């Protein structure tokens, strides 16, 4: 099954501000998520969110299996990303 990936505008703007190499690594990982959203992912403790590691960056997302949706919650450097979660 292929999931639909939802990336909010604020996340797209963050991606645009990141470097080309970082942006391409993140996008390729997001495309991979569409087919297998839990592969190489870890659940964030005490939340419904998942995370994947891409070098020093993290992608936080939620999965809605009944609708086949993946909603990207946040993308950022590992030292800053967990302050909200």
Predicted regions and their residues:
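A short, surface-exposed loop/turn module that caps and links secondary-structure elements
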Residues: 28-53
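Nucleotide phosphate-binding site architecture
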Residues: 12, 45, 82
